[in-house]
Curated annotation (Swiss-Prot):
One of its GO terms (molecular function) is arabinogalactan endo-1,4-beta-galactosidase activity. Endogalactanase involved in the degradation of plant cell wall polysaccharides, and more particularly of hairy regions of pectin. SUPFAM superfamilies: (Trans)glycosidases. It catalyses: The enzyme specifically hydrolyzes (1->4)-beta-D-galactosidic linkages in type I arabinogalactans. This is Probable arabinogalactan endo-beta-1,4-galactanase A. GO terms for cellular component: extracellular region. Keywords: Carbohydrate metabolism, Cell wall biogenesis/degradation, Glycoprotein, Glycosidase, Hydrolase, Polysaccharide degradation, Secreted, Signal. It is found in: Secreted.
Length: 350
């Protein structure tokens, strides 16, 4: 009787794996245009998407800008990237910045030609935009797993109308953007996400969701997932313990699955601007450290009811190895050889 019991337990063990073991490789086409060719762990040149899927990555996040001056990250750019991602067998997560450039807590600039004075006009423009994006993917027979309405929007979106001085406007915008996705021609409706920064900060998460839902203009049924960024090098308070508390509270209060949609760990950080969180200081700045960090992070996410996944932000952006942080290198690729690091294999175990 012992052996059947052991065998019956095996599926339960495998079911604990993360649903999304992801990476954001938005810069891939730009890097390739600059002459970069990636190499796998055997030193052989191989398409980055194939390297990733062969090492356990099953979902790719892509940032989408509305009308960038040079075409970077626009809809056509993302269609080209998504076709490759889908052909490699991975799901696609579209991160709509709703801007012509970077959108984050410090800047949420409304796209050129969109209203900055009338909220009804802006909500209609947003609806039509999310509808157009999804319909264009449908026309190209590309499935979309997740769509995020905005990027790191704890300070609002589509400024000035969508600033946090008016949460009713924020709610209207999120509702409208979500329904553009829902009304699209995609065969399977993507999961709709709201994405905030500082995932470890429960007070920040609670205030945003409590306030925006209290307006009545955004319904709980308008979105499916709650996404967070979690960067350990921006605050000593960003402990794994705080992240677990925050994610647990988010899921229990709002009954939505949670995903860590941006994270990094450095292989080199000689002069960090901030002290690292106390429960992470034993992890080395190395490829082995990246593996250890992601394994610990996965334990936190898996330990939360409906904790679905992790996306590593830009592991192969060789021309931007610090990835905007004070650390010198957060990549999973050797900047001198273009060969992936051993840490890329960690996704198989998450």
């Amino acid at each position: 009787m012992i052996y059947p019991l052991l065998l019956s337990a095996l599926p339960l063990l495998s079911s604990a794996a993360l649903t999304y073991r992801g990476a954001d490789i938005s810069s891939l086409l730009i890097e390739e245009d600059a002459g970069i060719s990636y190499k796998n762990l055997n030193g052989e040149t191989q398409a980055l998407e194939d390297i990733l899927v062969n090492n356990g990555v099953n979902s790719i996040r892509q940032r989408v800008w509305v009308d960038p001056s040079d075409g970077s990250y626009d809809l056509d750019y993302n269609l080209k990237l998504a076709k490759r991602v889908q052909a490699a067998g991975m799901s696609i997560y579209l991160d709509l910045h709703l801007s012509d450039t970077w959108a984050d807590p410090s800047d949420q600039t409304t796209p050129t030609g969109w209203s900055t004075t009338d909220i009804d006009t802006l909500t209609w423009q947003l609806y039509n935009y999310t509808l157009e994006v999804c319909n264009t993917f449908a026309e190209n027979d590309i499935d979309v797993e997740i769509v995020s309405i905005g990027n790191e929007i704890s300070s609002g979106l589509l400024w000035p109308l969508g600033k946090t001085s008016n949460y009713d406007n924020i709610a209207k915008l999120l509702h409208s953007g979500a329904w553009g996705v829902k009304d699209s021609d995609l065969t399977t409706t993507p999961k709709i996400m709201i994405h905030l920064d500082n995932g470890w900060d429960w007070d920040e998460q609670e205030y945003f969701y409590k306030t925006v839902l209290a307006t009545g203009s955004l319904l709980s049924t308008d979105f499916d997932l709650m996404g967070v960024s979690y960067y350990p090098f921006y605050s000593s308070e960003a402990t794994l313990s705080s992240l677990k508390t925050s994610l647990t509270n988010m899921q229990s209060n709002y009954d939505k699955p949670v995903v860590v949609v941006e994270t990094n760990w450095p292989v080199s950080c000689p002069d960090p601007e901030y002290s690292f969180p106390s429960d992470l200081t034993s992890i080395p700045f190395s490829a082995a450290g990246q593996e250890e960090f992601l394994e610990k992070l996965a334990e936190v996410v898996e330990g939360v009811t409906d904790g679905l996944g992790i996306y590593y932000w830009e592991p192969a952006w060789i021309d931007n190895a610090g990835l905007g942080s004070s650390c010198a290198d957060n990549l999973m690729v050797d900047v001198n050889t273009d060969e992936v690091l051993e840490s890329v294999t960690v996704f198989e175990d998450l």
